[in-house]
Each structure stands twice: as structure tokens, then as C-alpha cells.
Amino acid sequence: MADNPGLPTDTENPSTTFTGITAEQFLTQYAIRQRISDAIETGYTDNELLAYINDAINMTWGVMIQMDYDEIAGYMTMTERKMEIPKDYWMPTGKPPVQRHNHMLYCYGDLPCTFRYWTRPKFLRTLQDTLPQGMAWFNPALLNLVAQMVVTLAMQNHGFDMGAEMDFTTSIAKLLPK
């Protein structure tokens, strides 16, 4: 747990102790396959469902950036003028004296230079991959919204009218605290 400071550490309460949830567990726990009404019986492949989960993660991640969720930010201190970009780096949250070129960051200001950056979400390639880690992603309300988004995206892409469901999901998302 020490490697994941954003995760709950209350080991006396299993419902608040997370080690990760795989795509397969997510599909099962949130009954995604059962919730998708496939009246035209086209079926949804694992790869399609993974793509819908990734789309939902990406949309949620974008909203979390707009809402300035610190849970999806990283912090970096540059002690040298040139450093390799961390694997989870996406972009700085502000305007630090740092430039990105290929896989390197260059500091043109005073050292050491500490700045905050948005992390890149982890996308799923297989059913055994885990959803993004961190307290924000393991909020049950957020996982329910991601599940509803997956169902809505899957059904919309197969021609079902999901306008009301998407409006409902959007309304609930607006109620979540920052």
C-alpha cells in the first residue's frame, strides 16, 4: 500500500481497502453485459467493451481535469536542466518554466523546480488490466457513473436512443462534490 498513497489503508474495513479492479471484475461487478440491451443480437466483443471502458475513462478524466481534481495530478521536482518524462506525465497544470521535447523535459528557470502536472490515465488493453488506481477512481459513485457511461456508449453505438440515460448520467455527475 505504501506505493499507492492515494488508496485507503483502513485494513480493518475490507470495503475501503483496494488493490485494484480488473476490467473483467468491473464488467461483472457492475453487470455491464447484463445491462446492455442487445435486441438486435449483434453481441459485444471483449475488445468493444474495453474500448467503451477506455472512452468512459477518458471522458471522466477530462471532467476531473476541468474540475481540478488533485487526485489525478502528479508532482515533480526537477533538480537538473534535462530530465526524462515520467511514464504517467501528460502535461503541466500551470505554466512552469519547463518545456517538453519528445521524451524529455527541459527546465529554463531556477533549480530545483517543483511543479504539478496532470497524469495520463491508464487505458485497458485486456480484461486482466486494472482500472486506473487512486482514491478518485475508487469512489463508488464515480465507478457507477463510468459503468453507466459504458452502457450508454455501447448502446448508442449500436443504434439505440440513449438520450434520456445520458442526460440522467450527466445530471448525477454534476451533483458529485469536487
Question: Where are the regions that the model predicts?
Answer:
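Glycine-enriched, solvent-exposed interface loops adjoining structured elements
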Residues: 2-178
